[in-house]
C-alpha cells in the first residue's frame, strides 16, 4: 500500500509542470518555498474584477501555457488581489494580508503592479502590464 501511495505522489509531482503555476497568497509561505527551491518570487498586485490592464495581463501572460509552464519551474507566484465585486470578496484575513503587502511593496497603489523579490523578500525588480508576448515578459522578469 505504501508503495502505491509513493508512486502516486511521484506521478502527481511530475505533472506539476504541466498543470501550471500555483498561486500563493501568503508571503511567508512563498518566501519559504522560494528559499527551499532557490527561486525568485513574483508578487502580483491586481484588481481581478475591475482593472482592465490587470485582466489583460492575466489573459495575455499569466494564463498562457507558455507562462504557466515556465513559472511553475522557475518562480514562486504570489497574488495580492483587490476585487471590488461582492461575489469576489476575499476573507477578512486575506484582505488584511493583501493590504499589508501593498503597504510594503505597492505604496503608490499601482494596478497591475508586478514585483520581483528574492527569497528573503527584497525587491530585485518591478514592472506592470505591457502589450507583449509571454516570452518577452519572462525575459523582462528575469
Question: Which ranges hold each PLM region?
Answer:
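Typically the conserved alpha-helix immediately C-terminal to a functionally engaged Cys/Sec
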Residues: 54-72
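Short active-site neighborhood of thiol/selenol oxidoreductases, capturing the structured segment around
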Residues: 37-51
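Non-catalytic, surface beta->alpha helical segment in thiol-disulfide oxidoreductase systems
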Residues: 97, 103-104, 108-142
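Hydrophobic beta-strand anchors of alpha/beta hydrolase catalytic cores
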Residues: 42-43, 77, 114
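Bacterial Sec-dependent N-terminal signal peptides
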Residues: 1-22
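The canonical Cys-X-X-Cys-His
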Residues: 51-54, 114
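A short beta-strand-turn-helix
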Residues: 24-41, 71
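Thiol-based oxidoreductase modules, predominantly thioredoxin-like and allied folds used
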Residues: 22-24, 67-96
